[in-house]
Amino acid sequence: TQPNPGERFIYTNIVEVMGVSETQTKAVQTGGLGFGPFISTALEAGSSMMAIAPSYVRRGSPAEAAGLRRGDLIYAVNGTQLTTSNYRNYMTSLYQSPSGSYKFSFLRFEDNGEGGYSLNAYESGTAMSSVHIYDPVLHASILTDPDNSSTKSGYLVYESFDLNSQEFLEETIKDFAEAGITDLILDLRFNAGGAVAQSRWLSGCIAGAANYSKPVTKVVYNDNSTEDWKFDYGYSNDTDALGLPTDLGLDRLFVITSYNTASAAELVISSLKGIDFPVKMIGCRTEGKNVGMTVSETTYSGRRFQFSPVTFWVRNAKGWGDYKDGIEPDEYVNNDNTLTTDDADNVFPYSFSDWGNMDYNIALQWAYCDITGKTR
């Protein structure tokens, strides 16, 4: 269920810049263990023993190197059992994890070969909280229909539109193009936005060369001046330095969304709908951030600050941009209400297994079945 449906946010912000700013480096580094936010569960009814499962584990992170995956049920950290009295602290500390060395005891659902799953126990390697290269591609794979080998579906889980991580996105799109995918399932459930330029580039890959000259978005600034961006190069020839998109040869898009999906992620959906490119949304209503910020930096008393005031809002080719209350999906996996009994997946957008397991990734299963014509 969506926390606080209809809640509004103030997006303008001021932050102090510590160390090297993102605008001064090409390779973006991040710290910590590489976990996403956690979901919790009781290990057994009537017991105080708890487990927490990460929403994702970033590629190339210390947590991945230690053997952890999305959905693994961590029940002990450095030998300390998680209980009702301490698990919340671990949910916060492991997500932020500014420093430290960790070993995890965890359970993993695995195919038992009999049409079901076994819950198997594992011990991780040592994970040292450390600086590592940030990769917003949380998962990428190609799903092939065993009954029709010509049907190939690219599945991309993308966390953030980060210009300095463009190489990771380009590599994934190149792999999809070389494999000749016939459909794309774009999972934006944990994507809160980022650079409009990269959103434009990915939208162009999906829309294809036949639509390059069409408007991807109209940017309307606070003084009512406007910029018309196109799918090919954005505002003007190669302004954003990303170049022409890679034409994936698609004629539709399946996109998975949640209440985390916002800003530049919502722009992909809006821009494609603006040119009547078929988009099917599965998941739950998006956040509803149809405004953007321009980042500037200043120094005061020897300290550097970044100012990010809201300076523009966006409209698509049809003039539509009124999604401040979010964009509603075509099919709800998890309803925007306080109930769990009417949800197809009552822990969405979280999971207790890895990305590719459709038994635990209902949104992916629905998209895949729509593509292949199989029964859900």
Description of each model-found segment:
Residues T1-L184, Q198, G208, R376:
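Flexible, low-complexity junctional segments that flank or bridge functional domains
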Residues G154-L156, S165-E171, D175-D183, A192-R376:
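C-terminal "post-core" interaction segments
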